[in-house]
Amino acid sequence: MHSSTKKAAEPKRLTKNGKVYGDLLSAEEKKKLVLQKKKAKKTKKVRQSAQQTIPYVEMCRDGICKVNSRLYTKTIRFNDINYQLAQNEDKTAIFENWSDFLNYFDSSIFVQFSFINQRTSISEFKKQINIPEQDDEFNDIRSEYSEMLQNQLTKGNNGLIKRKYITFGIEADSLRMAKAKLDRIETDILNNFKTLGVKTEPLSGYERLKVLHDVFNMDSNEPFRFSFDMVARTGLSSKDFIAPTSFDFREGKCFKMGKAIGAVSFLQILAPELNDRMLADFLDMDSNITVNLHIRTIDQAKAIKSIKMKITDLDKMKIEEQKKAVRSGYDMEIIPSDLATYGGEAKRLLQDLQTRNERMFLVTILIMNTAASRQKLENAIFQTASIAQKYNCALKRLDFQQEEGLMSSLPIGLNQIEIERGLTTSSTAVFVPFTTQELFQSGEALYYGLNALSNNMIMVDRKQLKNPNGLILGTPGSGKSFSAKREMTNAFLITEDDIIVCDPEAEYYPLVQKLGGQVIRISPVSTDYINPLDINVNYSEEENPLTLKSDFILSMCELIVGGKDGLQPVEKTIIDRSVRKVYQDYLADPVPEKMPILEDLYNILRSQSEPEAQRIATALEIYVHGSLNVFNHRTNVDVNNRFVCYDIKQLGKQLKKLGMLIVQDQVWNRVTINRAQHKATRYYMDEFHLLLKEEQTAAYSVEIWKRFRKWGGIPTGITQNVKDLLASREIENIFENSDFVYLLNQASGDRQILSKALNISPSQQNYITNSNAGEGLIFYGSTIVPFKDDFPKDTMLYRYMTTKPEETLQN
């Protein structure tokens, strides 16, 4: 199925001289419609208050609403999924599952889908993204970053809250009888949504009332204040807490609700085929709009019987026309074209119902526009009508039925508009309620750019993921390092997390120093030292931290001594024995001056008689007494600073592998200490492929990806070499255990690999093909969203974060 799914709508249109004059109505139907309008205009009951206008009897705490003497309803809020950018086979699967979902409802269930786009106070969003000042020297940076976020907010329509609801109801003699059946239907609906991969939330009575309050009071920023205890305490009805100041339906073509003005129209389907983009286009409008689909299932047996009767009637008409032709001397095969068309359509419809799992529905589609002024309302209605026209449909105002239209636009499951259109399952399913997901969380959410489809801000908190491990992937110049620095800066400003960077290219130190961090430059000539034998009592989950530390020192010796065949079993035994000896004094009295160094391990090895011990000691000698002795010192830098950068650019070829392994162990030390303090540790590894090329560092990286999550660690690998991530089954675990992936522009080969591994559709691939710096796809759990980040270049932070030589600010 292509990006625009089209299904037959089976219209019955009156045509004359090639022109379409609208849906074909019988004399009886016309009479009924005229009577309806007269009834609405002349005999409408005048209600005495705004509360009396709201058409329900009682709202219960558990979310069941008694709408009238027999109708009881419940509401479920559901989220969006990616449909418009999905793979064609995925779109087909979504469409088919959605069709099966619609077929679930039998004729005893009333169904209403409500899509409410409502502008809210932008100040609420600004509060969420505002970074409050703190008592430190970084408030100028906070102010600048906060201003950047405020500017990005204005580019989208984050001020527009988009909600999707399904309301379902049944008729019953009592609340008790209704509850059991509604609960069963609710469970089935939730399971159907789960099959579609859609997150859902059944609404309580309070939440349903809040939805109604927000619809009725969209002109006011007054918060919803209500509890069911207040009803008993005050003697008021729940309607008193949700009603607007007034309703005014006197104009006939529009209504007033408080200070807001609105109008309800119905969608007249004239198109021979329907398009799955139509609903999405309505909901993409940047104004207050509510779209409602009221759906009634026709009993299958009755539907088939009705169509058979219609076919019989058409056949009778055909016979009459043929008789007339014979009497007039014409060819009896020449009959009116409309008659032939309707006959063929009716037979195809009957075949669909009998053989293709299609059902018949009566559908009412209502669209409500609201605005602060009449001019804005007319503009919104014009835009809505233009979208309808684009898809060969018409938007018809509900003249003198605005009150019924408004009440039918509330998610309470009541349809007071008797304008229905017969549609099959496939035609109804074309109104797919899914477009693209938004990623906007509150709390400690960080900024990752703008949604490329909606221009809305992407704000997420990786800690909310089941597995916060992450990867930032892209070609050189695509913005990998910049994206990592932006995330680090954001985390530094709004969280208490510690941040550690392994920096093989000396790209991060300007930012680290600006944020008061510690840059540790490790090289053969540096005086910054870190001790590979550092340990703390929390180093392992086990009571004895030496087991895990011994494993690290074995990996280190493997790198130094091992060669092609690695360490032999005897050598591993000797090293393990020596490790336990070297830590005896420190563990007995854990003070810094008793922390062992590499030379202590070397001396213990030298004191042992086995030739293997001497071989290991000899291999270690260059790292103890020789020219590579940079790691034979106690740590003399502040590894406990909140922001630490390990600059290993100058380590040289001989020491780089060992240096990366030792840095990883230092990070593990920090993670274990922070875990005891309930603090998260963010660890960034630039040029991540370098760690994956060596067996020891690759194995250690895999362990980090497995262990970090439950210790409060959030590792992030940054690389341009996707192939190295899939070099072996073991390393592939890193890819599979990353719930956060930030994809920037990709080379052709890597793009194909990633598309297969991450199930990226051709439409989504466009966002990582020849894309500009800072553009791509963000994978957050099961959600995929295209993004763009045009970070302002006239900011101080930009100059500290960019890696472009002409723009870099060196300190």
Where do the PLM segments sit?
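Extended, folded cores of ATP/NTP-driven motor/assembly subunits in large transport
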Residues: 1-434
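Hydrophobic anchor at the beta1->P-loop junction of P-loop NTPases
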Residues: 472
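Conserved P-loop NTPase
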Residues: 758-811
